Amino acid sequence: MRLRRLVLPALLLLIIIAAAFWYFWPHSSNPNALWNIISKKCVPNQRSTGKPDPCAQVDEQHGFVVLKDLNGPLQYLLMPSARITGMESPALLEPETPNFFNQAWNARHFLADKYGKPIDDSNISLAINSQYGRSQNQLHIHISCLLPQVKTTLAREGAQMGYNWQELPEKLLGHTYLARKVTPAELNEKGAFRILAQGVPDADKKMGHFGMAMVSLPGGDFLLLASERDLLKLNNASTEEIQDHSCAVLDPVPR
């Protein structure tokens, strides 16, 4: 009887956690939608007509495409032109794989082009969700505006970070994040994925559990962020949460 009294509450708790996690899990009727756009439209159109439609850019030589996301007036996605599912892909840790974070940062000009005026780098962020916090099975880096409240927090906390991974002193949107500064040269040489895999214990064995983000810092360095999936805390490591696709941080707000 005592065992039953212990087991039943524990089982009920697990059911509640599983139900809550399912509720927060991103769902998609077609998880291959992005890959279909790349492989059946953007790349073939670029090859046959020289126009990347519906993508904004196709660069097969450097292994990426850029697509305007339907969510938000300025959000763009940078994606591999080849099939790479996401954070869990071993290819991301290979030195010959394109430096997608570097490419995504270089593609931020699409936001300003769409907005019609320059956008300060402090308002821009990159984010890629974990294997468990995404709805699409093609790697895609969100290039979008930073949430105003997150911008304020990172402006305050970012200066305290060093060039090794450590826990961000203040949670972002209730979630714990790891953070570290990175120079443009290091980002260009190693890429964000290998910096995470080589710098956080055992991260290379469970890369799919992590979501990553990046913002710029005064002086030219970047701040890399990483969030790890935590079932008990209902955190699916969807780092896109730090972004605001409405771009309320801009004045005037785009429409």
Show which residues each predicted segment covers.
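N-terminal Lys/Arg-rich, disordered targeting/topogenic segments
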Residues: 1-3
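HIT superfamily nucleotide-processing domains
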Residues: 5-9, 17-255
